[in-house]
Amino acid sequence: MKVLAPLVLASAASAHTIFSSLEVNGVNQGLGEGVRVPTYNGPIEDVTSASIACNGSPNTVASTSKVITVQAGTNVTAIWRYMLSTTGDSPADVMDSSHKGPTIAYLKKVDNAATASGVGNGWFKIQQDGMDSSGVWGTERVINGKGRHSIKIPECIAPGQYLLRAEMIALHAASNYPGAQFYMECAQLNVVGGTGAKTPSTVSFPGAYSGSDPGVKISIYWPPVTSYTVPGPSVFTC
C-alpha cells in the first residue's frame, strides 16, 4: 500500500468535483441555479482561508439571484459532477474513486441568501457521512450513487433564508497539511414551515476546521485506517 500511494496521488492529481445543482422534491433546479458554482473544479486546501466557507479564490465563483424554496423537514439532494460541462452520472462523471473522505452539510441563517458571503459565524452541521465499519467512505457512496448527496433540512429550525454548504473532503493526499482537498459550494435557500423550536449552536468558516484536526491531517493508506473522526462540530438534531 505504501508503494502504491504515490501512484494513486499522481493519477488523481487533477480529478476534482463541483456541487453543481440542487434537487428539491425530485426536481433539479438547474445548473448553477441557486447554487454558487465555480468556473474551475479545483479544491480549497487552506482551512484558514475565507474561501473555505463557500469556495472562492483561487477559484472564480459565479453569483446567482435564485433563492430556492425548501420545506423544513424534507430532504434535498446536492448533485456533484466532475465539471460543469459533465452530463453523465457514472462514477467517473462525479469524482475520481481515489478521492476518499467524508461528505458533510451545513446551514447558516442569513438575511439575504443571494448576497450573504457565508464567511464568519452562524454555521451548523446538519449531515455527515464519514467511514463506515466496512471501510467505505461517504464520498464513495456519492461517487457510486450518481453524484447524489442527500441532506435533510431540520424541521425544528426557524423559517427564513439560509445558505446550504455541501462539502466533500478528499483525503488521498492528507498525510501532511495542507493536503486534504475541500470541495464545497453554497446553495441559496428559503426554508418554509420550520417550527423554530430549537436554536442550533454555531461555528465559523474559517475557524471550524484546523490543519491539525485528525479528520484533516490523516494517512488513509498506511497504516490502515480503522476509524475516522469527521472534522467540525457534531450534527445538529431536533
UniProtKB/Swiss-Prot annotation:
Regulation: Inhibited by increasing levels of ascorbic acid.
Signal sequence extent: 1-15
Post-translational modification: N-linked glycans containing mannose and N-acetylglucosamine.
Catalytic residues (UniProt): H172
InterPro entries for the chain: AA9, AA9_LPMO
Uses in industry and biotechnology: May be utilized as part of enzyme mixtures used in the degradation of lignocellulosic biomass for biofuel production or other industrial purposes as it improves efficiency of conventional cellulose-hydrolyzing enzymes.
Cofactor: Cu(2+)
Keyword Nuclease: no
Gene Ontology BP term (one): polysaccharide catabolic process
Cystine crosslinks: C54-C186, C156-C238
MF-aspect GO terms: copper ion binding; monooxygenase activity; oxidoreductase activity, acting on paired donors, with incorporation or reduction of molecular oxygen; oxygen binding
Protein function: Catalyzes the oxidative cleavage of glycosidic bonds in cellulosic substrates via a copper-dependent mechanism. In the presence of an exogenous reductant ascorbic acid, degrades phosphoric acid swollen cellulose (PASC) to cello-oligosaccharides and 4-ketoaldoses, the end products oxidized at the non-reducing end. Somewhat active toward tamarind xyloglucan and konjac glucomannan, with improved activity with glucomannan in the presence of PASC. H(2)O(2) is able to substitute for O(2) in reactions with PASC, xyloglucan and glucomannan. Very weak activity on cellopentaose.
Quaternary structure annotation from Swiss-Prot or TrEMBL: Monomer.
Protein name per the record: Lytic polysaccharide monooxygenase NCU01050
UniProt gene name: gh61-4
